[in-house]
Amino acid sequence: MTEISRPQPGEYSAFHARYVALVPEDDLLAAMQAQEAVTAAALGAYAATPDHSYAPGKWTVRQLLGHMTDVERVFGGRLLFIARGDPTRLPGFEQDDWMRAADFGRYALPDLLAEFGAVRRSHLSLLRWLPPGDWTRRGVVGDHDFTVRALARMMLGHERAHLDVLRERYDPVRPG
C-alpha cells in the first residue's frame, strides 16, 4: 500500500475542511473501499421510498444519491487534472444548478447505488495507480489550492457528510 499522509491546512479550502475532518483513518483507500457497503445499506433502506425528503423543497433520497455521485465525479476529475500536473485553473460548480439540470427521478434507487459504486471503484483504481509523488501535487480549483491527497480524502468525507444528513434529518421522518 502507498502511504497517503494526511493533508494539511492550505491543501484545501476552509469550506472543504469539514470533509477532510470526517476521515480520521490512516488507510484512506481501505476506508474508501469499506464505505461502499455502509453507503449501500444506509441508502438501500429507502428502496421503497426513494422520493422521500425530510422537508418540502429539500432533496429526495434519490436526488441526494445522485448529488453524491456527481460530486464524486467532480472531485475525481479535479484530482486527475492535478495529479497529471495540468496547470488549468479548474472551475467550481453550483450544486443546485446541477440538481435542476439532472433528472435523478428517472432512475431506480438500486441503479443509482450501482452507479455510485462503479464511480467509487473507478476512483479507487486510479488512486492505487498514482505514483507516490502525485499525492502532494497542487492545483487550483476556483480560488483555492488543493492537493491530490486532499481531494481523495474529500471524496470520502463528502460521502460521510451526506450520510450524516441522512441519519439526522431523513431517518427521523422516514415514512412507514
Task: Describe each model-derived feature in a short phrase.
Residues P24, Q35-A40, E72, E159:
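A general secondary-structure boundary signal
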Residues A30-A45, W98-T136:
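Acidic/histidine-rich alpha-helical segments that form the ligand environment
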Residues E25-Q33, K58, R62-L65, L109-L113, ...:
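Amphipathic, non-membrane alpha-helical segments in soluble helical-bundle scaffolds
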